[in-house]
Each structure stands twice: as C-alpha cells, then as structure tokens.
Amino acid sequence: MNPIVPAVERPIEDVQAKADERQIAINKVGIKDIRHPVRVSDRNGGEQHTVANFNMYVDLPHHFKGTHMSRFVEILNQHEHEITVRSFREMLREMNHRLQAESGHIEMVFPYFVTKQAPVSKVQSLMDYQVTFIGEIKGDKPQITVKVVVPVTSLCPCSKQISDYGAHNQRSHVTVAVRIEGFIWLEDIIDLVEEEASCEIYGLLKRPDEKYVTERAYDNPKFVEDMVRDVAARLNQDDRVSAYRVESENFESIHNHSAYAMIEREK
C-alpha cells in the first residue's frame, strides 16, 4: 500500500496588494453603513449603550489595486469599549496606520437619549437626538466634528404681530455641527440650542405642561433667521469650538414647504 502524501498547501494570493497599472489614486475607499454596538459617555458620569452606523474610508495610492476591507471591521471590533472624542481620534490614527494610508475618514451616526423633566408637572421622559461624529485625519492630525440634530418649537413673530389671537408655530430641526478643540459634552450642544428656541420640546407633557410650553413659545417668537443667529452668537463665545455650521429647518404648519437658514464660520 502506497503511503498517503499530504497535499501541499498553495499560498493564497493577495490580489488587492498587486500593483495597478492605471496610475489613478482613489480619494476614499472603505466600508459604508455598517452597524456596530457602542457605548457613549454622558455628562452625568454614566454611559449609554446604543447602535451606531459607521462609514470608514481611507485614501488609496495609485500603485495599489485595492485596500484591505477586513481591517476596517477588525478596527471596529477592537473599539467596542466606551466611545469618546479621544478614543475616536485614536481610532482614526489606528485606521491610517493599519491601512498604510495618508488620509482617513470615519462617520459614526447614532441615537442619543436625554432624560428630560416636564416644566410644571416634573414628570420625566426620554428625548432622542441624532448625533454624528465625523473624523478626518491627514498624516497624524485628526479633526473631529460633532453634529447634533435638536428638535425644537418655533413660533412666527409676524403671525403673532398681525393676528388678533394665536400665531402659527411648528416643530423645527436645528442641526449644529461643531469642530472641536479638546472636549465637549453632547448635552452642552443640546442645551445651547434648546435655550435659544421659542420653546424646547419633551417626550411627555401633562396639561399644565402643555399650557406652559404653548405660552412660552408665544412669549418667545423667532424667525428661522433668528434661530441660527442666536445659536451662532453663543458658539462665537465658546472657546472649545474652532468652526461651526448651524442650520435650522422649520416644518411650516401653514405651508407645504419648509423655511431654512444656515450660518457657517471658521473662527
């Protein structure tokens, strides 16, 4: 009987590491819309367990055929621990190092919850806010932008002025994107916006609370232009913010369109 000769394993070819002859570099290549559990620290000293959607890209030099897609997922799996601005910077650096890239980009979108107390009854409920961390790195210099969508109430000053009673009001989305130096709490951004709105909104209100928020908005009317200017004025005074973009969209209750305003500034 002839002895069994073990098969010789052939090396697996690394196709993406081959040279590319077209001599065209790629600005961004990577993975898009991958969901991953994360833990986000909050201002009260706790943390929230949530699920984020990630986009992760790097540049690719003209002489490489492809990037190493699996390494993006490996990096995510290594960062299941608490996500902060600091750890987000570390993730950017690690991604560039692992993929031998000159520049990198990570976006992380997730719901963030804040426990709010109704203004009169003091009943508590959760409010959700859409948060995005955007990281850009070139060389070893990461830049972090934090974006928060804050729903508020807006009431029209013109409608109040010309009407014998009442004024049209609506829910608005104020989107604040700040490029930060150091650290900023998400709640700091949320509080700033809600303080400048006609009135903030709540997950749960009793009748005395409804009366309060209705009258509060009526006493504090604001155009969409007022909203972005008032938020921008606050951001101008915040040394943690090196650049910002403020957008406000009013979902008009008397029209089938929205009112919109935006201010963008490098400080």
UniProtKB/Swiss-Prot annotation:
The record marks C156 as: May be catalytically important. Its EC number is 3.5.4.16. GO terms for molecular function: GTP cyclohydrolase I activity. Pfam families: GCHY-1 (PF02649). GO terms for biological process: tetrahydrofolate biosynthetic process. Coiled coil: none annotated. It comes from the Bacteria. The keyword Hydrolase applies. Pathway: Cofactor biosynthesis; 7,8-dihydroneopterin triphosphate biosynthesis; 7,8-dihydroneopterin triphosphate from GTP: step 1/1. The keyword Hydrolase applies. Keywords: Hydrolase. InterPro entries: GTP_cyclohydrolase_FolE2, GTP_cyclohydrolase_FolE2/MptA. It catalyses: GTP + H2O = 7,8-dihydroneopterin 3'-triphosphate + formate + H(+). HAMAP family: GTP_cyclohydrol_B (MF_01527_B). Belongs to the GTP cyclohydrolase IV family. NCBIfam families: PRK13674.1-1. Converts GTP to 7,8-dihydroneopterin triphosphate. This is GTP cyclohydrolase FolE2. It comes from Nitrosococcus oceani (strain ATCC 19707 / BCRC 17464 / JCM 30415 / NCIMB 11848 / C-107).
